[in-house]
Each structure stands twice: as C-alpha cells, then as structure tokens.
Amino acid sequence: MPLAPLKPLRRWIWRAFLQSALIPLVLVESVLIGVYLYTNESIRESQVGYLQSSALQDLDSAVRREGKVIDSRLRAIEAQVGVYRDAVAEALADRRFEPDELERQRHASTPGGVFHSRSDDGRAASFYAASTPAERQDRDKALRLSRVDPLMRSIKQADPLVAAVYFNSWDSYNRIYPYFDVLQQYPHDMDIPQYNFYYLADATHNPKRGTVWTEVYLDPAGLGWMMSAIAPVYRGDFLEGVVGLDVTVGQMLAETGNLQVPWQGYALLVGPDNAIMAAPEPNSGI
C-alpha cells in the first residue's frame, strides 16, 4: 500500500492558521467595520437632525423677533396715517386758509382739462385729472391742501420706509410728496376711485373707517411694486377722499433681507390672509 504524500509543515501550519485565526479575524473585522459604518451614519443623521432642529428653533426665534420689529415699524406708519388724515380733514374744512402766491403760480391747466403743478419748490405734486371736467374741479380745494405740505415732507423724511405721502379725492384730485412730473407720469383721464389704494378705504370695504393695508400693486406714480397704508377722510358721512403712505416692496425686502436663513432659505413677507406681499427675486442672492 503506497504511503500518502507528506505535506510540508509550512503548508499545514498555514492551513491551520487560516482556519483557526485568519478567517474568524476577517469576519470579526468585517462585522466591526459594518457596525462602525452603521453607527457613524446613525450618529451623522442624529447630528444633522439636531443641527436642523437647532437651526429651525433659532430661525423661529429670529423670525418672531424680526416680525415684531417690522410690525412695530408698520404700526408706526399706521399712526402717521392717522395724524396725516386728521390734518387733511382740517385743511379741507378750513376755507379761511389762503394759499400763498407761489402755490397759485406753480399751477397750470392743459388744453385737455388737467389742472396740475409744474414746479417743485420743495412742495407736493398736484394733479386734477381730466376725468373731472374743468368746470367741476374744486381748484380752491387743491390749492388749500398746500397747507399740509410741511407735514407730508416731515413724514417722508422721518421714516425711511415711507416712499410717498398722498391724498386722493373722490373727484380724482391727487396731491403727493415727494414732487415729480405728474403730467408726464399719470394718465390724464385717470379715474382715481377705481384704484385699490382708494376703494379699499371706502365704506363698502372699510366700514370701520380705520387704517387698512392694500395688497401689493404697481404704483401709477412710477415707484414700482408698492403696498399702501390708507385711511378714509370723511365729512360727516361723505367720503372726501383717502390719504395714504406708500411702502415699496424693495424697501420691505431690505428690512427682511438681513435675516440670515439657513439651508439656502430666504425670507418672505406674508399678509394676514397668507398672501405673499414681498419676496426676493430669483437668483438675487438673498
């Protein structure tokens, strides 16, 4: 019977080592690596979740704080509207007031029936639309309202959020500060009561006669996208007109744009009905 070939001692030792040590070691290391990777991923997800939760809490606090700041600024504007409304009502009622010669000289009429201011002189712009025939225009009223020009100027200068201060009458007369060339900017047959910055303050839309905010609209005075705080001016139960303070969307975005939003977010200004009132342009970097 032939003898079985002898295996070299080294091969026998290697096989024994492979079976008893190396393979179990590789298996254990594989398991440990798997556990490490799983644990590391779990820890990473926990850390990301914690950071996200922390960021959202910080953002919530920042938004609430910023909201209170903006709310206080807007309430200040509402208070200014109330002061301006009272001044306009008094100016309309005081027929004893005599406008100076400069105020008379800075007004002119077009052949089409527009009564308008033609020079700045540090005063408000004035525009009586041709939608009211010239013979029915209360031009004394238009000149009498020059009495409130200093207040309009003070309101505009006191609050950087305010882009313009104005009064619109029931018969399509507009007085607005700062001055601009109304004849070039406004439609000559402009029917002012048809605009939202007028009718939203009327008895139908605002029966409580308080200060209300418009939705965002394109300003006919050329100041871009705008929202206005407006309030009615009554003589008894007759609506003489509407006063307003304009705030541009760009100015509101400048207020909200400083808010640091994580996760590549950005700030929006949302109205009470959840309508977006102001948002940054796409790719604006905000």
Give the positions of each predicted feature.
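Extracytoplasmic/periplasmic ligand-binding sensor regions of membrane-associated signaling proteins
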Residues: 156-246, 254
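Solvent-exposed, extracytoplasmic
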Residues: 145-157, 242-286
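Extracytoplasmic ligand-binding sensor domains of the Cache superfamily
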Residues: 79, 83-93, 109-117, 150-160, ...
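Short regulatory alpha-helical segment in sensory/regulatory domains of signaling proteins that mediates
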Residues: 71, 85, 89, 152-160, ...
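Juxtamembrane membrane-water interface segments immediately C-terminal to a transmembrane helix
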Residues: 38-85, 89
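Amphipathic coiled-coil signal-relay and dimerization helices
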Residues: 126-129, 173-180, 274-280
